[in-house]
Amino acid sequence: MPRNPLKKEYWADVVDGFKPATSPAFENEKESTTFVTELTSKTDSAFPLSSKDSPGINQTTNDITSSDRFRRNEDTEQEDINNTNLSKDLSVRHLLTLAVGGAIGTGLYVNTGAALSTGGPASLVIDWVIISTCLFTVINSLGELSAAFPVVGGFNVYSMRFIEPSFAFAVNLNYLAQWLVLLPLELVAASITIKYWNDKINSDAWVAIFYATIALANMLDVKSFGETEFVLSMIKILSIIGFTILGIVLSCGGGPHGGYIGGKYWHDPGAFVGHSSGTQFKGLCSVFVTAAFSYSGIEMTAVSAAESKNPRETIPKAAKRTFWLITASYVTILTLIGCLVPSNDPRLLNGSSSVDAASSPLVIAIENGGIKGLPSLMNAIILIAVVSVANSAVYACSRCMVAMAHIGNLPKFLNRVDKRGRPMNAILLTLFFGLLSFVAASDKQAEVFTWLSALSGLSTIFCWMAINLSHIRFRQAMKVQERSLDELPFISQTGVKGSWYGFIVLFLVLIASFWTSLFPLGGSGASAESFFEGYLSFPILIVCYVGHKLYTRNWTLMVKLEDMDLDTGRKQVDLTLRREEMRIERETLAKRSFVTRFLHFWC
């Protein structure tokens, strides 16, 4: 009979990234890997239950010895990772560029065109800003959990541990499907982008070239992979900076065609699309899911937790910096797009598919400016962007498979890691699914990917809601078990209230998506086809949840707060020493300039 993951005893026997110690793979890895065998739950409590932040409990003081300090400094990496076999070579810049690689792609360069045509320039800015505020709470929640529990797969584990196994299985499987579909989708997008220069060569030939390149990149060790993604992401960041400067110049009338543009297109054809307030509001609501999808991948910082050098410091830094970088990029670019491209421009809908760079508002903006040569350069950048996203998709998908295999949601052979720290079985399975990209030459490829994307269309929203709910439940358990927040290496800036805000707003986005999917914009009534294209992932989520319940025969709705394991996988912390460190840090920071304090808080 399988052990119950709702009980503390289950997590007490979990090591190596929360892999059951009884699994056959664990015994094999024992011979080739050095790992900690003393788990916090098998020794004395890792954290003193008394604290000034825990009312009603007597304060106790632990003696701090030189050996304590030595262990704290020298064994950080070993304790941080809880000895997963994955290579631990990713730094802050690697984590940041991995997230950028996953989040800045067709969502920004291409899909924003359809969103502009559907909702108008005001809808673009409003929706992306609202989603950004939710994302800020998600990033903070994720930073707190990942710093405390830097395990392989990150949030894939948190929802199972802090919410409920069936819920975790459904959300994780949906999230995994998103990355599985994204790989072939981006490869097809790359082949379509090539048609801008040459449409005579068979698309599958280009798919084969890109497929082989991505497969090779993911066969490298994780550090080499991180450096590859760093270069690709830097190209995207530089292109965004370049377009921002160019967009400002064009908007002010500095292009070859001359003439001040400013907010001209906000007045004609208008800030919103539609002739009535109801139609305009529906257009606004229909863009929300596009906004959320475009940000998907920013949670990659937590997926990489088990492969970073010092996750308790790097994860919060990378998460916050990633948020500001991606949010600033999107909001700035979208504002400029709204000024340079009218929402009724027919080219926004002329693409052969949702990933056709011909409908990119950035390319259209440059063409409208009359600058020769630059549209071709922007197309080349879009090509690099989609290849980068496909590269990140293999990484994210394989690590999610490892995490799900660790917690028993996928077959155990997927969690095996080779001597170079690569989860080869998971990578090969992901690449196998990528063979779907060879439908690029088919006339039905757009229809195929429309329905494949529908399988996980809302997965990003489900994932973010699960992260915020995990954080809420974690904090509730801390309170019930009378634990101190001083135990946490990083504390969310938005707190529990911020997590509730993000969860509620994302829930409202799901409701808005239900409405716009069932009653699509421009339709005469309810449309079953439109509904399943936009909302199919929700009934699939329910089926996965119920199916897991029936299979496991576990009818508990939530992990009990008093039973929640708050120790396993965390480093032993001396609260007295930690408080002294925090006091010194605050005093040192208080002497710094305002700019330094500002950057320290937000970045």
UniProtKB/Swiss-Prot annotation:
GO terms for molecular function: amino acid transmembrane transporter activity; high-affinity L-histidine transmembrane transporter activity. The keyword Lipid biosynthesis does not apply. Signal peptide: none annotated. The chain crosses the membrane at residues 96-116, 122-142, 166-185, 204-223, 237-255, 280-297, 322-342, 377-396, 424-442, 452-472, 492-510, 531-549. The modification Phosphothreonine is found at residue 76. It is found in: Membrane. Residues 66-75 have a biased composition (Basic and acidic residues). Residues 1-95, 143-165, 224-236, 298-321, 397-423, 473-491, 550-603 are cytoplasmic. Residues 51-65 have a biased composition (Polar residues). InterPro entries: AA-permease/SLC12A_dom, Amino_acid_permease_CS, Amino_acid_permease_fungi, APC_YAT. One of its GO terms (biological process) is histidine transport. GO terms for cellular component: cell periphery; endoplasmic reticulum; membrane; plasma membrane. Its main location: membrane. It comes from the Eukaryota. Residues 45-78 are annotated as: Disordered. Residues 117-121, 186-203, 256-279, 343-376, 443-451, 511-530 are extracellular. It is a multi-pass membrane protein. Present with 688 molecules/cell in log phase SD medium. High-affinity permease for histidine. PANTHER family: AMINO ACID PERMEASE, HISTIDINE PERMEASE. This is Histidine permease. It comes from Saccharomyces cerevisiae (strain ATCC 204508 / S288c) (Baker's yeast).
